[in-house]
Design a protein with these regions (language model features):
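Nucleotide/phosphate-binding catalytic cleft detector across ATP-hydrolyzing
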Residues: 1-48, 69-81, 102-199
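Gly/Thr-rich phosphate-binding beta-strand-loop-beta motif of the actin/hexokinase/Hsp70
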Residues: 39-69, 87
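Metal-dependent phosphodiester-processing active-site neighborhood
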Residues: 64-95
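Short, structured loop/turn "capping" segments at alpha-beta junctions
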Residues: 97-101
Length: 199
């Protein structure tokens, strides 16, 4: 009810233009849900894990027959900032170098040829360690990444592209590294809801 503002108009300014709207209906969805629905290959899976890797946390849920299972929602404090901080600390300890998060991320994306080779080695080792720790934490939270597909999205999804594969037997990853995918998914959901409303 509070999101609809009791039917009262809401005024705001966006990009220099004034707007007055009335909110008639609100739909709420868990983080990452809309992005997962953009993947046609997942729609026939009975159960799918969705892991949204953000800066501070990794938000988890399981979709059962495309529907979010609220009982499986978890938030792990294993976001990319923790990963980058740990990598930075290991480089400082091992090599005496103080690398920035931007430098480390550049190596993780595979486009940092100018970085010290020993530092790269530590970055890759720590990224591998982080990936295994993350997959283990997901399993400990009751979601078996070996038994069902795991969709990874958010800022940290790119990291898993290089460090988790179905071949290693740790999980069945589907990496969604398009930062606009949630918006695209919400657009599809809105279109479907509008079509149902018109019928």
């Amino acid at each position: 009810v509070y999101l609809c503002r009791d039917g009262k108009p809401v005024s705001f300014r966006f990009e220099g233009q004034d707007y007055v709207i009335t909110i008639s209906k609100v739909s709420l969805y868990p983080q990452g849900y809309a992005a997962a629905l953009t993947q046609g290959s997942l729609l026939d899976e009975p159960s799918v894990i969705v892991a949204d890797i953000g800066g501070w946390t990794v938000d988890l849920m399981r979709l059962d027959n495309r529907i979010p299972n609220a009982a499986t929602c978890r938030s792990l404090e294993l976001g990319m900032i923790r990963c980058l901080d740990e990598i930075s600390e290991q480089i400082r300890r091992g090599l005496g170098l103080s690398m920035t998060a931007a430098q480390i991320e550049s190596v993780l994306r595979g486009d940092a040829s100018h970085v010290n080779e020993d530092a790269k080695k530590i970055i890759y080792q720590e990224a591998e360690r982080y990936t295994k720790r993350l997959l283990s934490a997901i399993a400990e939270s009751g979601l078996d990444v070996r038994a069902m597909p795991a969709v990874f999205l958010g800022g940290g999804a790119t990291l898993l592209k290089h460090h988790a594969s179905a071949a290693d037997g740790l999980c069945r990853p589907i990496i969604l590294d398009d930062v606009c995918l949630n918006a695209k998914g919400y657009e599809r959901l809105t279109e479907r809801m509008s079509q149902k409303h018109e019928q």
